[in-house]
Amino acid sequence: EGLEALFHSHKGEIAAVISQPYMHGNFADNRLPADGFWQKVRKLCTEQGALLIVDDVRAGFRLSLAGSDSYFGFEADLICFCKAIANGYNVSALCGKDFLKNTVSGISFTGSYWLSAVPFAAGIACLEKMKKLSLPDLLIAKGKRLTDGLTAAAQKHGYDLRASGVPSLFYLRIANDDNLLTHQRFISEMVRRGVYMTNHHNHFINYALSDADIDETVEIADEVLRLL
């Protein structure tokens, strides 16, 4: 409704709508889109002649190899990828529909690393391996195993530890902790014991994380939560 109102009050002035595939910011529970949300946005952008652009820099390849728009059942006009595309090498990509090619080709822009072959080779190899492994499904499963274990351990010790967002890119917080200090102590003690976690940011699951790593993480969390 808010987007409809903006289009109505700025008719013919909005060139594009750009958004993350779901709300995965910091210091707040992540929020998935309601059923039908993106389909309505897609329809509205099409009717108003505005491009629909997805910022998939963080969530890209963690939900679907075809892009997060595919995961949520709609088609973006442009998608921005980075980070996971080459396993840490400096590569980013802007993917779009064919009808935009002529427009893009008319824009002059330069870059410093276009002839850097190693990142492109890394990107190709990484994408091929992700496809072979059906990686998003594995990452989501690993993330769910981890978050289920952590929340169960917390519940045992009287803490409401909440995991939100997609399990491959989850956000974690102790809900019954009004001043955030308990959560920060929890994370600090986890790091002290060799488990690198972050206070108020998303946790990015990777393929190298094994079931044994997850079990050890949950065991350490159980110990820390008992001592808090």
Range-by-range predicted roles:
Residues 1-228:
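Conserved N-terminal phosphate-binding loop of PLP-dependent enzymes in the Aspartate aminotransferase
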